Amino acid sequence: MKQFIKNTFRLLLLSILISSCGALGIHMKVYNPKKPGAYPKETRQITLLARNTKYRSCFDVYHNELNVEVVPSKKFISGTVIISAKAVTDFDTLQIDLYKNMKIKTLESENQGLIYTREEGAVFVKMNRKIKADEKFSISITYEGTPISAKRPPWDGGFVWKKDKEGNPWIGIACESEGSSLWWPSKDIMSDEADSADVLITVPKKLMAVSNGVLRDSIITDTKNTYHWHISYPINNYNVTLYVGNFKLLHDTYASTITWKTTQLNHYVLPYNYEKAKFHFQQVKKYIAFYEKKFGAYPWQRDGFKLVESPYAGMEHQSAIAYGNGYKNDYENLFDYIILHETAHEWWGNSVTAADLSDGWIHEGFASYCEALYVESIMGHEAYLNYMYWQRISIMNKRPVVRKRDIRYFDYHDEDIYVKGSWVLHTLRTTIGNDSLFFNILKTFREENNQKQILSENFVELVNKKTGQDYNWFFKQYLFNREAPFLEYCWTNDTLYFRWKNTDTDFVLPIKIKIKDKTIVLHPTTKIQTVALSNDYPDFYDNSNELYYGTEVNKKLPELIRNQ
């Protein structure tokens, strides 16, 4: 999902970020709000949507088939969804999900109607018989209704009903935090992905419908058009999408130097933007090549890659990325931020997926860090450091990067899963001090967890394994604690006093200081330590662009050390 940063502030910093030959000559202040950010109250509605109860864990979905008709004039949809699954345990009741404003017309299995009850967004389905473990089964749901409209897509999601400048309907949807059950009946939990899917979308004549995957068939009649899209890879439910509009196909190809396979690039754009898109979308191939080099092969080669011109800024729908940035490059015409960021999600978020929205930094933090890595690849390390400085400005420290689990929480006003998540990786890179090892960790993490749903703890385990060291102290502080570490210090004529604040006793991040032209590595702990100064002023800002921590003068340290 596109990062929520004020464009005016970006422009203000533009010349500093891009043209500077060195790191910024200021120490960026770190904030630790006294009051932590709140989470939503755990209502029954949240519990039913977010938790993997026995009514969900009892079955594993392997295929979804959506057959949906979109009626733009009424902002109305109707259709049938067939969920094919395999039983994990014996059961006779399961839970699927559909927002309560959407009407269920029929619910069947094996051509027999099923009894069901609805509570909030949950639908509890009583099967006609006990389903045995390992048995395959399917249920069919016919439904209709007016889905929720997005207030601020893609962050505050739902359907987007707009018209292009020629007056044609132009429709999209984004539902990462709200869930797929906003518009189609599904097992709406991030820890279960179908192995494949088919999406059939019917729209009024003269309009086209685009979804994920490959276009299998088009049925054109005098009044309606139906488009059949097939997804041949696992896909998380919120990524299943549709776009409706008067689109024109822009075809291209990408030849991988990693796999030596050719991926089809089938972009769908509004006809009056075709010539702009033809030039502008060439940059896609540069980004795919860069990410393949860093993290391995593009994950969805059979399904291709496409940008679809959308009536909102952007969203990382798998193999069908929403694009709404107006064909503008950012940062002195170097790259289109939306394309760069959303394409990164094909590796981070779509290939490697968080099993719970609380671990969304694996999507957004990694994708935001990819932006900085791309800047480094085209402009060098100093530009990379300056880009990281820009991200650091927005860190809020109101909540831990890994949020509270089982509540499906996402707040677009709090950018820390983006920018602090990115800084976790940046700080880890500095702390490991071995770029070859660091990037091997990232690539291994992606390749070992391709098409899997994971938690932050899986990344911690891999870092510990690859480095041969225990980095639990690092991740406990930067992922699971809210506050940033602060280095308290003061100096007398001949002594520097220092210690960590807002950390546990096992936090052992080394830092560098400069005394004249000499660099000294300190190993602070929560206990006060000293270093001889010889009347020279210490510079703590030497690696403030390499590590995330704050500094604070505490003149009481010389007195306090006597009482340790």
Please tell me what each predicted stretch does:
Residues K285, A322-L385:
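Zinc-dependent metallopeptidase catalytic helix centered on the HExxH motif
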Residues D414-L496:
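Amphipathic alpha-helical substructures
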Residues G79, C175-E176, K187-L340, Y369:
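Hydrophobic helix-coil surface modules that form long, contiguous segments used
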Residues K103-E110, Y471-N472, W491-N545:
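Beta-strand-rich binding/interaction modules
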Residues C21-S78, I82, K162-N168, N472:
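N-terminal, polar/Ser/Thr-rich
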Residues Y31-N32, Y99-K162, L533-S534:
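A surface-exposed beta-strand-loop module
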Residues P36-Q45, Y55, T142-H251, F540-Y549, ...:
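Extended, low-hydrophobicity, Ser/Thr/Pro/Gly-biased non-transmembrane segments
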Residues E364-V424, T431, N449:
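Acidic/His/Gly-enriched intrinsically disordered linker/tail segments
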